[in-house]
Each structure stands twice: as structure tokens, then as C-alpha cells.
Design a protein with these regions (language model features):
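C-terminal helix-coil-helix/basic helical segment that borders enzyme active sites and/or dimer interfaces
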Residues: 28, 262-269, 280-335
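Glycine-rich beta->alpha junctions and the first turn(s) of the following alpha-helix
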Residues: 3-5, 187-282, 353
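Internal helix-loop-helix
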Residues: 39-100, 104-109, 151-157, 279, ...
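A short core secondary-structure module
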Residues: 139, 143-189
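Glycine-rich phosphate/cofactor-binding loops in nucleotide/flavin-utilizing enzymes
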Residues: 17, 60-65, 85, 226-235, ...
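A structural signal for short hydrophobic beta-strand segments in well-ordered beta-sheet cores
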Residues: 131-134
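Amphipathic, small/basic residue-rich leader segments at the start of a protein or domain
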Residues: 1-80, 101, 105-108, 266, ...
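A short, Trp-centered hydrophobic/proline-enriched beta-strand micro-motif
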Residues: 109-117, 161
Length: 382
């Protein structure tokens, strides 16, 4: 594997660090921030096609940008779903008209996207979606419910997996549609209050929402193929940026262990060292995958490893705090949203890591069948 950083990469790193230092402090509005990123050409670095207002960059430069962004005080991205998921999908499956309509606004930070996949009865079993898209003279009428939809409350558009042929077998009657969210009375977004006290996810209800006929990606009935290719874009360069955040969380847990005296416990010290060693291993595995080394199951292995690692870190964070880990703020009241400290938020949010983005069970099935060559899992109607 050859994945070193060249002199040009380090020059690019210096440019990225200087720009972030000058612009990323004190950001208040995330939509404005997306436009700032777009104006500077930082959106769409990894797109395989230029010409949409995006700036092209090598793979190593994409890694540099992702890592420096993670180290900076810049806010979490609200345009990453459009940039990292929809855009590569349109480049792979979209028509020239779809690309020219949707890619420039994504690159400019002008349009934000959300993903309409999961439903109350179709999570890991994505082929079981019940949302329907009925053909009309000018497009499709969409009816159904999506759940766990990140950023739906901010998004301008949603890419929706819906059933266009109810009579077809499960994987063959689906289509991938681009749906505008600004349809009063036809699209309703309801935030989901989590046990962390925040509302990062939403329910989305489509009641006769309209999608134009030319906004079906990959053609009617080919939604499963398009949707699966999109999921392949979920784990890429962003994995390395994620690991920068993990390293910062681990550092805070180590400091807490020292401050509370928990680090005097040899069992705690052993667990801290194991977390550090495993994180380094995950980084090199990610670099190997990006460098083209590894088997087809590498993304599933990576997801399985980091999800378990992060959950164990959350458990360790509560252990080193002792009894204080269960204490809430002294001024909490039902009328005021409560605040969690970093270790509490880490523990609670990490419980979802083994579910979203493909559950551990799904990842193990992929590894078993595609890497180890074990017999396929028995299925019902396929």
C-alpha cells in the first residue's frame, strides 16, 4: 500500500488549515456555513466528475481535508448527505439533466438533502418499504412514512425509496425519487425527542407529495440497485475524519480517568490502552481500504469494528466518572431542556452505533456471505 502524503498534499493541508482558522470560528448558522464552504470550493472534492462548481482533489487531499475539518472548530456539516451520498449516486446513475440540475446547488451549499429510506416496519429489512409512488400524468404521488430521517427539519429535498409497482417482487418494484420538502400539507416533518434530550432525527409523513417524472434516478423499478450503490458511498474518506473525533473523545476519557483517580486501577489502564491500540488499527485499515487494498467486505468490517469500539468507549467513560456519571444538572426542570455532559452524551448516543448505517447483524451477514463464502442466509420472498 502506498498512502503517503506528498509535498503537494502538505501544501494543500496548509491551505486547508489556514482557511479553516480564518473562517470556522464562531459559526452560528449552519446553512450560511454551507454556502461559505461552497463559495470557497470545499464541497465536492471527492466527486469523480468536475464541472459542477466543485473543486477536484486527489484521494490523499480528500483525506487531508476531512482530517483538518475534524480538528477545526467548524460545526458539524448539514450538507454532507447531498455531497457524500446523493451526488456520487447521481454521477453514477443520473441523467445529464439530473446532474446539471442538482449537483451545482449542492456544490454551492444552496440546497440541503435528507435520506428517505427507513420506515417503522422497514429498517434493516429495507426491501420491505411500504411508501408508495403512484404514477400520474406529470410525475408521481407519494404516500407513506419515513423515520430516523437525519436533517429532515433543515432539508430542501429528500431522496426517497418508494414502491412504484406493488405487484412486483420486493426488490423489483422500487424506485429512487427526488422529492421537494417544501410541500405544505403534503410533507410533514416531526422531530423525534431522544434520550439525550436532543432531536437529531425526524419522522417524515408524505400525504400525496409530488415528485416530477424526470426526477426518478436510474429509471422506474431500478430503485433497489440505486439505493444499494448509495449505501456503498456511506463509508469512505469520512471514516478517517470520524476517527479524529474518536481520538479526541478518547483523550477526554483519559484525562477524566487521571483526574478522578480511576487511572490508578490497572483494569482501567488496560482498557484505555486497548482503546488506543484498536483506534490506531482502525485508522490503518481505513487507509488500506482507501488505498485499494483489502477485500470486498472491508467496509462492513470497518463498520463492525468502529461501532463496537465506540460503544466500549462510552461504557468506559461512565466507569471512570464513577457515581457522577449518573448525576443530572442541579437546575433541571421539566420546563427546560436538560443538558448532558460529554461522557453522558457519549454513552447514550453510542448505543445506536451498532444499529444505524447497517446493523451489526447485517454487517456480519455480508462478511459471512461475501468474504468467507458461507451459505447464504435463508430468506423469504426475494
Amino acid at each position: 500500500m502506498d498512502f503517503g502524503f506528498t509535498e503537494e498534499d502538505e501544501t494543500f493541508r496548509t491551505e486547508a488549515k489556514r482557511w479553516l482558522a480564518a473562517h470556522a470560528t464562531g459559526v452560528q448558522d449552519r446553512r450560511t456555513w454551507e454556502r461559505t464552504l461552497g463559495q470557497a470550493g470545499w464541497i465536492g472534492l471527492g466527486w469523480p466528475e468536475p464541472g459542477y462548481g466543485n473543486r477536484t482533489a486527489t484521494l490523499t487531499q480528500q483525506v487531508v481535508w476531512a482530517e483538518e475539518y475534524a480538528r477545526s472548530p467548524a460545526p458539524p456539516r448539514s450538507g454532507h448527505i447531498g455531497e457524500n451520498l446523493l451526488a456520487p449516486t447521481l454521477i453514477a446513475h443520473g441523467t445529464p439533466e439530473q446532474k446539471s440540475r442538482f449537483l451545482p446547488p449542492i456544490a454551492a451549499g444552496d440546497e440541503l438533502w435528507c435520506q428517505g429510506y427507513s420506515e417503522p416496519d422497514a429498517g434493516s429489512d429495507l426491501a420491505g418499504v411500504r411508501t408508495t409512488a403512484v404514477r400520474e400524468p406529470r410525475g408521481y404521488r407519494i404516500t407513506g412514512q419515513k423515520i430516523w430521517t437525519s436533517l429532515a427539519h433543515e432539508a430542501d429535498w429528500c431522496f426517497v425509496l418508494a414502491r412504484t409497482d406493488p405487484g412486483a417482487r420486493r426488490h423489483h418494484g422500487l424506485s429512487f425519487l427526488l422529492v421537494p420538502m417544501d410541500q405544505p400539507g403534503r410533507v410533514e416533518v416531526r422531530p423525534i425527542r431522544q434520550m439525550t434530550g436532543t432531536s437529531d432525527f425526524n419522522e417524515v409523513f408524505f400525504d400525496g407529495a409530488h415528485a416530477r417524472a424526470e426526477h426518478v434516478v436510474g429509471g422506474e423499478g431500478n430503485g433497489w440497485r440505486v439505493a444499494m450503490s448509495l449505501l456503498g458511498f456511506e463509508r469512505g474518506v469520512s471514516t478517517l475524519a470520524q476517527q479524529i473525533g474518536f481520538a479526541e473523545e478518547l483523550g477526554r476519557v483519559v484525562r477524566t480517568a487521571v483526574d478522578t483517580g480511576a487511572a490508578d486501577d490497572p483494569v482501567v489502564r488496560d482498557r484505555l490502552v486497548r482503546q488506543w491500540a484498536e483506534l490506531r488499527t482502525m485508522r490503518w485499515n481505513a487507509l488500506r481500504t482507501l488505498g485499494g487494498v483489502g477485500d470486498p467486505g472491508a467496509p462492513s468490517v470497518a463498520k463492525l469494528l468502529w461501532a463496537g469500539w465506540h460503544q466500549r468507549l462510552g461504557e468506559l467513560a461512565t466507569r471512570v466518572r464513577g457515581a457522577a456519571a449518573g448525576a443530572g444538572p442541579a437546575d433541571w426542570s421539566p420546563a427546560a431542556p436538560y443538558e448532558l455532559d460529554e461522557s453522558q452524551h457519549l454513552f447514550l448516543f453510542s448505543r445506536a452505533d451498532t444499529i444505524y448505517g447497517g446493523s451489526d447483524q447485517i454487517q456480519r451477514t455480508i462478511i459471512a456471505e461475501r468474504v468467507l463464502g458461507l451459505p447464504r442466509e435463508p430468506k423469504g420472498d426475494v
